[in-house]
Swiss-Prot record:
It holds the Pfam family Ribosomal_L36. It comes from Bacillus subtilis (strain 168). Keywords: Ribonucleoprotein, Ribosomal protein. The keyword Ribonucleoprotein applies. One of its GO terms (biological process) is translation. The keyword Cell inner membrane does not apply. Part of the 50S ribosomal subunit. It comes from the Bacteria. This is Large ribosomal subunit protein bL36. InterPro entries: Ribosomal_bL36, Ribosomal_bL36_sp. GO terms for molecular function: structural constituent of ribosome. Belongs to the bacterial ribosomal protein bL36 family. GO terms for cellular component: cytoplasm; ribonucleoprotein complex; ribosome. PANTHER family: 50S RIBOSOMAL PROTEIN L36, CHLOROPLASTIC, LARGE RIBOSOMAL SUBUNIT PROTEIN BL36C.
Length: 37
């Protein structure tokens, strides 16, 4: 999980979602998981 000021999808399988007001990227590749914070 990477915490970044700006989250972007890295590959085609990355999905940008909102969870409890936070923007997150979820993906099949665990290295691509990101959280805004």
């Amino acid at each position: 999980m990477k915490v970044r000021p700006s989250v972007k999808p890295i590959c085609e399988k990355c999905k940008v979602i909102r969870r409890k007001g936070k923007v997150m990227v979820i993906c099949e590749n665990p290295k691509h998981k990101q959280k805004q914070g």
